[in-house]
Amino acid sequence: MSAKSKQYFNIFVFIISLIFFDQLSKYLVAKYVKLGSIYFSFFDDFFRIIHVRNTGILFSMGSNIHYSLKKIFFLAMPIFILIFVFYLSLKERNCIARISLLLIFSGGVGNVIDRLFRPSGVVDFLDLKFYGIFGLDRWPTFNFADSYVVIGMILFLVYDFFIKRKVLNK
């Protein structure tokens, strides 16, 4: 196997592993945790597993818009963006930047799969106490795909602000 083929194989395995873990966790929550109920909590209610559905996007924004507009804004547009992010990840030479883009891509695909095959909404289940920060008692419930996107964005910002700029300023 050539170095390029091995690199693409590793990217494929990374993406499939992340999407599989996300979809498996959502499947298990949807199957075994009653909608709206708390399955269990840890550390004095700091972390909970709770089954909710999100028909909107980030923090349930857009939940009330018309179904056909949702298909355009929450399905078609993200698919085009994901294709672009995947293309960028293949072109990127820096390992941190590539991993960050692949995390964003994998998380986006995980949630697009839910939008395609779960008409009742994306399965969210990770729930954290937020102690009144930003006026929130609890952070909006999320899933592993959401985590991949956020971690990928943070990694990319770190890369852009600290690594890429340092290289460009030399």
Curated annotation (Swiss-Prot):
GO terms for molecular function: aspartic-type endopeptidase activity. InterPro entries: Peptidase_A8. The keyword Cell membrane applies. The chain crosses the membrane at residues 9-29, 72-92, 94-114, 143-163. PROSITE patterns: SPASE_II. Pathway: Protein modification; lipoprotein biosynthesis (signal peptide cleavage). One of its GO terms (biological process) is proteolysis. The keyword Transmembrane applies. Keywords: Aspartyl protease, Cell inner membrane, Cell membrane, Hydrolase, Membrane, Protease, Transmembrane, Transmembrane helix. It is a multi-pass membrane protein. It is found in: Cell inner membrane. The active site is at residues 124, 146. GO terms for cellular component: plasma membrane. Its EC number is 3.4.23.36. It catalyses: Release of signal peptides from bacterial membrane prolipoproteins. Hydrolyzes -Xaa-Yaa-Zaa-|-(S,diacylglyceryl)Cys-, in which Xaa is hydrophobic (preferably Leu), and Yaa (Ala or Ser) and Zaa (Gly or Ala) have small, neutral side chains. It is an enzyme of class 3 (hydrolase). This protein specifically catalyzes the removal of signal peptides from prolipoproteins. Belongs to the peptidase A8 family. PANTHER family: LIPOPROTEIN SIGNAL PEPTIDASE. This is Lipoprotein signal peptidase.
